[in-house]
Structures are given as C-alpha cells and as structure tokens.
Amino acid sequence: MDEIKVVPYIPDEDYDNPAMVVDFYEFTMANCLFLHGFKDTTLVFDMFFRKNPDNQGYSISAGQRKLTRFLLNYHFNAQDIWWLRTKGMSEEFCEYLRTYRWKGDMYALPEGTVCYPHVQMVRIECDLVGAILIETYLLQTMNFHSLIATKATRVTGLNTHTPRSVMEFGTRRAQGESAGNDGAYAAVLGGCVGTANCLAEMKFGSDVKAVGTVAHSFIEFFPTEFDAFKAFADTYPDSVSLLLDTYNIMESGLPNLIKLDDYLCLLYTSPSPRD
C-alpha cells in the first residue's frame, strides 16, 4: 500500500468547531479501539460528582441545554480531518470521522434540578467512538454550568425563604468569552435577575436579561454625585439603577439617592384633579 503524504497543518486562530474540544488521548484511544474492530461496541458512561463544592449540602445540575445542542450538531470538518492526519490518526479512522454524526442516547436530570453526590447527572449510551470523544466537552460544560448555578442559588438566597435580587456581573472576570456567556446563563438559572453581559441576552433571549447600573467613572465625570444621579434618572426615568459607594454610602450616596427620589416624585407625580 502506498504511503499517504500528509500535508502540514496550517494553524487558524479563527477556526472553531466544538467537536474538537477533546483531550488528545481521547482520539488516540478511539483510533486504537477502532482499528481493533470495536467501533460498533456500545459503551455506557455515567457522569456524577463525589462531593458538593465547599462542603455545602447540595448542587444544581446545569449545562444540559448546551450539551444537547452540541450533540445534535456534532460533526467533523475537513480541517479537523486534516489536523488529525498530521497527528498520526489512521486513514481509516479519519475517513470514518468525515461523515460521523453522534447517534447515541443521553439521559439527564432536568436542567436546574437539585442533585447530590454519586447521583448520575448525565448518562451516555453510544457507540464507542461517540462515547469516548465527547467526554471532555461533556465534563467541561456540565461542571462549569453546575458550579455557577449552584453558587448563584446561595448568593441570591434562592435556597432560602428570603431570596434577594442579585445581578450577575462576572463576564469581565470570566476565563474568556464563552465562559462569560455560559456563566451568565447559569447564574440566571440559579436565581440572578439578569446579567451585565449583552451578548448573553442576544444568545439566550430575554430570560437572560441584560441589565446594569453605572460605573464609578460616570459618577466622577459630573461635578457632584447628585448631578450624576439626576442626569441618569432624567435619561432613564423608568429604569434608575445607581451606585452608592463611589464616595461614601452613608454620608453621600444614600442622602443623594433620597434627594433624587424627592426630585423624581415632584417631577412625575401628577397633581390631583380638581373637582
């Protein structure tokens, strides 16, 4: 048999295919088992965790929505096959992946369900290749979403009788754009009233509503704190959300908020009609 010449792969920073979010050893294992005739063998994998984060009493199972979308759209592109050839995968395996679509079964707790250690969050039943190659993406998606959703229920008090209105503001500290979007979704699932992330609402809809306050720099731009409050309230009278801690909450922020409330009451309260 003639040796197949493999053209060196050219990196592309703009390329993105979630199916390639795979730890490399998944490919080496799948290729080996494929060549030994096990490609049609059905495997069953359960995903569970051994202890709750921070030794708390429960966790929230989340990430099922994104995982389902991933499996429904699972495929490999020509660029993926090209790269796999350069990494030593067999020609037979690469040709198999070229037309491969995920065709297994996924059983999972409903997203947002309370769950506990050693309880299966997700069960996968699939042919050997599909079961092995999705492990990395499955764990990444479920672990991250569940972590954020669980933390959000505690921050918002959703796990108590006195929940609080909390806005998610984590994108600027997230580990990348995808984490910012997924974190916003999971935080709202865990009880947050909205997110500062505009793209999250564009992706997920009004259930993940984009909301916000103002920055300290906005307050400092004006001659006085009250001037800043008034300018914002005049612009957005139906949605006033402000910061009180730019200077001093008790000595400045709160008194100026009360002053603003008096101003808005006079401005927008209609006089009683005369008899």
Language-model features: where?
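N-terminal, Lys/Arg-enriched amphipathic/low-complexity engagement segments
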Residues: 44-95
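A short, hydrophobic C-terminal helix/tail in secreted or cell-surface proteins
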Residues: 272-275
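Buried, small/hydrophobic-residue-enriched core segments of structured protein domains
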Residues: 2-42, 51-53, 88-89, 94-106, ...
